[in-house]
Amino acid sequence: MSSLFIAGHEFHSRLFTGTGKYASADAMMDSLTASESELVTLSLRRMDLKNQTDNILKPLQQQRIKLLPNTSGARTAKEAVFAAELAREALETNWVKLEIHPDPRYLMPDGMETLLAAEELIKKGFVVMPYVHADPVLCKRLEEVGCQCVMPLGSPIGSNMGLASRPFLEIIIEQSTVPVIIDAGIGAPSDAALALEIGADAVLVNTAMAVARQPAKMGKAFRLAVEAGRMAYESGLGERRVQAQATSPLTDFLGALS
């Protein structure tokens, strides 16, 4: 399986993960270890940045996993930029997952505010990874202003509904010149495999791993699914057909018998 490059950083795993909803820090680390994920997103709201022994942050830093702070909870571009600057100072990283969702019920991303924040953050030297609707026009605009990737949703956050937005994801993948990471709604390893099969460069999974009865085993399942999906894509999937096509035609064989 080929490596993925974002802003010059090489990732051997195409499975990115989150840190929310786990029953404990130990369960989180067991799951992440089994998944072999090399990038983990985490919310500033859930961390005690002044506490060097924070039970989420410290084990992640010890594992040398790349940390991707997110701006979850921001309702405007201004709030998102402020959160990103706090994260850069506290975690010494200029990478940020840009999330702006003013609606607390459905957590739908605000595309207009996201574009405004992305432009400002890029000017400030951030590597911006924006979480957005599966909107091909918006994703292209974000690419044009300098985002290093785009992160369209498969379905609503935490819904486990899979790739409900597949037709639009396929358009985004087809026209994008930056990595496409499908984020949100991936509820089963089969969803992750499908995402990679249709050409997504990576997926970000959190809820499906965190709420599983055995998070570590689910982490491994997602790792294998992502590897299989990417391998299938790189191998070249067969074309879908309406009509049947025999794998072993009998025409010549039957003619020789007559």
Swiss-Prot record:
This protein's pathway: Cofactor biosynthesis; thiamine diphosphate biosynthesis
List of catalytic residues: K97
UniProt: 1-deoxy-D-xylulose 5-phosphate binding residues: G158, A184, G185, N206, T207
Keyword check for Iron: no
Keyword Cytoplasm among UniProt keywords: yes
Record-listed E.C. numbers: 2.8.1.10
Pfam families according to UniProt: ThiG
Annotated GO MF terms: thiazole synthase activity
Keyword terms of this UniProt record: Cytoplasm, Schiff base, Thiamine biosynthesis, Transferase
A Gene Ontology biological process term: thiamine diphosphate biosynthetic process
InterPro entries, A to Z: Aldolase_TIM, Thiazole_synthase_ThiG, ThiG
Primary site of residence: cytoplasm
A GO cellular component entry from the record: cytoplasm
Swiss-Prot/TrEMBL catalytic activity: [ThiS sulfur-carrier protein]-C-terminal-Gly-aminoethanethioate + 2-iminoacetate + 1-deoxy-D-xylulose 5-phosphate = [ThiS sulfur-carrier protein]-C-terminal Gly-Gly + 2-[(2R,5Z)-2-carboxy-4-methylthiazol-5(2H)-ylidene]ethyl phosphate + 2 H2O + H(+)
Compartment list: Cytoplasm
Function: Catalyzes the rearrangement of 1-deoxy-D-xylulose 5-phosphate (DXP) to produce the thiazole phosphate moiety of thiamine. Sulfur is provided by the thiocarboxylate moiety of the carrier protein ThiS. In vitro, sulfur can be provided by H(2)S.
Quaternary structure annotation from Swiss-Prot or TrEMBL: Homotetramer. Forms heterodimers with either ThiH or ThiS.
HAMAP family in alphabetical order: ThiG (MF_00443)
Family: Belongs to the ThiG family.
PANTHER family: THIAZOLE SYNTHASE
Protein name in the entry: Thiazole synthase
Organism: Marinomonas sp. (strain MWYL1)
Classification lineage: Bacteria, Pseudomonadati, Pseudomonadota, Gammaproteobacteria, Oceanospirillales
GN (gene name): thiG
